[in-house]
Design a protein with these regions (language model features):
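N-terminal cap/lid segment of alpha/beta-hydrolase-fold proteins
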Residues: 12-55
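Short beta-strand element of the alpha/beta-hydrolase
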Residues: 56-65
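The serine-hydrolase catalytic nucleophile loop
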Residues: 66-78, 93, 190
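Conserved alpha/beta-hydrolase
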Residues: 81-98
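Alpha/beta-hydrolase active-site loop
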Residues: 102-122
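Primarily recognizes the serine-hydrolase "nucleophile elbow" in alpha/beta-hydrolase
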Residues: 117-172
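Short beta-strand/loop motif that positions the catalytic acidic residue
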Residues: 172, 178-180
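C-terminal catalytic histidine-bearing segment of alpha/beta-hydrolase fold enzymes
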Residues: 205-255
Length: 255
């Protein structure tokens, strides 16, 4: 009898109690590159995951949701994206994981420093860079979009769990795809109204996708609420939402 493949151990965040399974990237990556970079007077740690492709790959850069999270919070995205040909850059927030400093400050500045480090890496197609921001990260991106674009203009922006209404989204001068949960209280404002406002402001195009039966961070709660202390949460990402993101980025990459 063949023994089942052992699963990597979960890492439990001592600050939040959340369990972050180690992503299983061996089959979908040719390299997992550890990257250290400076932000102010501290050194932060990130990781570039390159897909199994002999050519340079389009890059997806992640701007985190709120909380003292590490790169492992987006391990499920690394698995999905590298398996479909995208490189992905994730990093540990200040004061957590392998990053120095004290958690609780400078998140926008740290995201800019991480972006600067990400787009200079070998193995990525600098002309095909996407920014994927989630929740509070969408506000950070909107507030500092000109600074991100000065480093490298993104060919597209995906707003996961977007907090941006019609006024704030106008700051993002790039093609935009909005993905939000159907459980949001202001759903129309952050989806249809936001997309319409962006279309009125810019010629790039804006689309949106509403993830049914999901919670704010786009995990499926059709059957029961998410237990973030149980590593199986990582398997409950909303399939439709993530496929919507991949399809949209592929379309831009091919056109």
């Amino acid at each position: 009898m063949t023994k089942p493949e052992a699963q990597p151990p979960a890492r439990v965040d001592p600050l939040t109690g959340d369990a972050y399974p180690t992503p299983m990237l061996e089959l979908s990556t040719r390299e997992r590159r550890q990257v250290q970079f400076a932000s102010g007077d501290v050194t932060l740690a990130g990781e570039l995951d390159l897909p199994r492709s002999p050519e340079t790959a389009p890059l997806v850069f992640i701007i985190h949701h709120s909380g003292p999270v590490t790169r492992d919070a987006y391990g499920y995205l690394a698995e999905l994206l590298t398996s479909t040909g995208f490189a992905i850059f994730r990093f540990d927030k200040r004061g957590v994981g392998a990053s120095e400093g004290v958690y609780g400050c400078c998140e926008a500045e740290d995201a800019l420093a991480a972006y600067r480090a990400a787009v200079t890496q070998q193995g990525i197609d600098r002309g095909q860079v996407f920014i994927v921001a989630q929740s509070i990260g969408t506000e950070q991106l909107a507030a500092h979009f000109e600074e991100f674009a000065a480093i490298q203009p993104p060919v597209g922006v995906v707003l996961l769990s977007s907090l941006l209404g019609p006024e704030l989204i106008a700051a993002i001068a790039a093609p935009v795809h909005i993905i939000v949960s159907d459980s949001e209280s202001n759903l129309d404002a952050i989806s249809a109204q936001a997309a319409a406002a962006h279309q009125q402001q810019w010629p790039y195009g804006a689309t949106y996708y509403i993830a049914d039966h999901s919670e704010h961070t786009l995990f499926d709660i059709s059957d029961e609420p998410i237990d973030w202390s149980d590593p199986v949460w990582v398997q409950r990402y909303h399939r439709g939402a993530m496929q919507s993101m991949i399809d949209w980025m592929r379309n831009i990459n091919e056109n």
